[in-house]
């Protein structure tokens, strides 16, 4: 039986997926036993939080854990002592040995792909575009857009992002690729224009359609409850939502964390994850960027193929799900974009979007050269 949440434009099932079971999160973060501060007026809540900060009072453990996690998603702070600086350099050197630059190891990567089909998977924020203060201004450069077009003309290519498809497509402006938005919960194939000049999507996959009304409601609630926290921004990503705190003063993080926690208590079918300076809220279905990668490979006919080399490039915690899938498949390469050492399931690293651009350029050049030699 075809899952009712899987939609194909020609009304035919692609994969015959089984019905996806929605589970309830058991995370203690969402425990109903934890008291909410919202019995208090907002001013009183702020005074309590400010008093706790000034007097070094202990914030409730579950919120403290959440704040620590929010700090972990921040860029690594510079340390003052020369000893720590030397230690950091040693750690980075050791990390680079374990996860060498994909540029330095380029020949090793393409040698493994000889005679096989490379399939490219690309995150957006922090990978194709730089991380910026305002998420609405995370524009891709002209050079990056052109190289993505070149990559798409040589390899099956997908952008896998937490953003909505509409938002990321407006940034990228490339039709010849797959878009997997909302952490893979919204997948569309390359578009083409019909005789009337209208675009047609080949594939549309939405395993969380039933959550749309719930997501919309939570977006509205959080927009209302966070508007008094300067710098907080709620973004509707269609099948998930983001609460950005990049521009929020760190002293306000406990208040923001409490707002998010208090809202999610009433929505146990939603779970909280984190990215770089962003809280991600999404359905508790078993679906992530790794599942999206597998879905796309299966759609392309490479589910059980030994002649495919998936390459996934991303910078975020949520990309680790895709890196892990590649490890489990025993094929392909995960490339982490990061300037600082991080725990990762990737095989290689790149420092920033400019290095991603260089890697993609070299990949296109290699492909054109090998085609010319055939």
Swiss-Prot record:
Q: In which pathway does it act?
A: Glycan biosynthesis; trehalose biosynthesis
For this UniProt entry, the molecular function terms from Gene Ontology, in alphabetical order, are: trehalose-phosphatase activity
Tell me its EC number(s), please. Answer: 3.1.3.12
Protein keywords: Hydrolase, Stress response
Its UniProt entry gives the catalysed reaction(s) as:
alpha,alpha-trehalose 6-phosphate + H2O = alpha,alpha-trehalose + phosphate
> Does the keyword section mention Transport?
no
Write the protein's name.
Answer: Trehalose-phosphate phosphatase B
- This chain's source organism reads Arabidopsis thaliana
Record gene name: TPPB
